[in-house]
């Protein structure tokens, strides 16, 4: 048997992180057994359809490195891979169920169904269709109230419907009794529950890997397989990703539920893959950092934890920092480019000068960022045009008072004659002038210099930053900062909350 698995997202908005989570485990299982991973778009709910959502699904899964073997954009032997392009597929199977007595027409109007549900709630009865239409012809049903000219088709759930089934993750699973599920809507579109079974069978899906919220639907899905004379696939119901309050993670409550949010926030795809794997899987040796290929090599359903994991972004931040620190410098520089372009610190396209400067600067921030987005703030002093450089108001107020003037002047005097403009030479000159010469502690000696050079109290390594900034720009910034300090500091320069100390 060739393993075939699928994910089947709906294009109803921004892709959900759960789509990536399910894709990861489907793909890992398929790769472990040399099988195929299928992407199917379930777009029959036209009321919620969003035009560009399908492309976002493609782009976000590919960004995450979770590519598929067959799908709408690739084709394959079991296409088409959009449900809306398969509508002629479903009706013959509905007719087969009607003919065999496993389904029936229902002419109840939406108003009649709403009133029925309200009455069931009032009487504290289990919800479900009351079978008013079952066994009646259209004419017989039309004589009763709440009639609709446009019928739906419902499954006829037998009294002895099996409610247990084997699951690859959970063992033997019990589910609640289903009611008479609609399988064909009044507009002629199949419902999810019917289309998913037909499509999975016709696409030769051998294993259905999906979230635990579908456990309650599995008995009716299994009935459809049996009634249509099809072999059952095996099921694996994954634990749901949950918020810290244990509620299901949703885009309404948690921005991290949006798959695109992770790219926007500067997470690496390999870090997010690792994190999503940890949400449901443990490696045999207990390690937390592992690649997708390492996960595939060890993959076994017995290692999936059925308990819903809490989506802890703090752990993801730690993993992301680890992966950033592990990148080759040129790779890191390349990945920083779109975020620096978004911040308008480098151009599009990147100039040769910008490219060289970025590759030299990337090591300065590699140990200091947990997100790629954080590099823009740290490197702005280096990449921004000199006429746009400014000192943060808080840094100016706290550091560039009159007592900083002497150390800044001493720094200028020490650096002006320096022939070797390298980080080590800059460090030695400032150490001799400020620490040895003025008797200052290193923190007090170098902080005014840091603020003068970078505009911030927290920055990449100071001496390496000055080397990249260059002699002329470094000395010019020191002179401007010294002038601010000579004038009585930031207060004398008219700096207040929300303003900035310009150094031009």
From Swiss-Prot:
It catalyses: tRNA(Glu) + L-glutamate + ATP = L-glutamyl-tRNA(Glu) + AMP + diphosphate. Keywords: Aminoacyl-tRNA synthetase, ATP-binding, Cytoplasm, Ligase, Nucleotide-binding, Protein biosynthesis. A motif ('HIGH' region) lies at residues 9-19. A motif ('KMSKS' region) lies at residues 248-252. InterPro entries: aa-tRNA-synth_I_cd-bd, aa-tRNA-synth_I_codon-bd_sub2, aa-tRNA-synth_I_CS, aa_tRNA-synth_I_cd-bd_sf, Glu-tRNA-ligase_bac/mito, Glu-tRNA-synth_I_codon-bd_sub1, Glu/Gln-tRNA-synth, Glu/Gln-tRNA-synth_Ib_cat-dom. ATP binds at residue 251. It is found in: Cytoplasm. It is an enzyme of class 6 (ligase). One of its GO terms (biological process) is glutamyl-tRNA aminoacylation. One of its GO terms (molecular function) is tRNA binding. One of its GO terms (cellular component) is cytosol. It comes from the Bacteria. The keyword Nucleotide-binding applies. Catalyzes the attachment of glutamate to tRNA(Glu) in a two-step reaction: glutamate is first activated by ATP to form Glu-AMP and then transferred to the acceptor end of tRNA(Glu). This is Glutamate--tRNA ligase. It comes from Acidothermus cellulolyticus (strain ATCC 43068 / DSM 8971 / 11B).
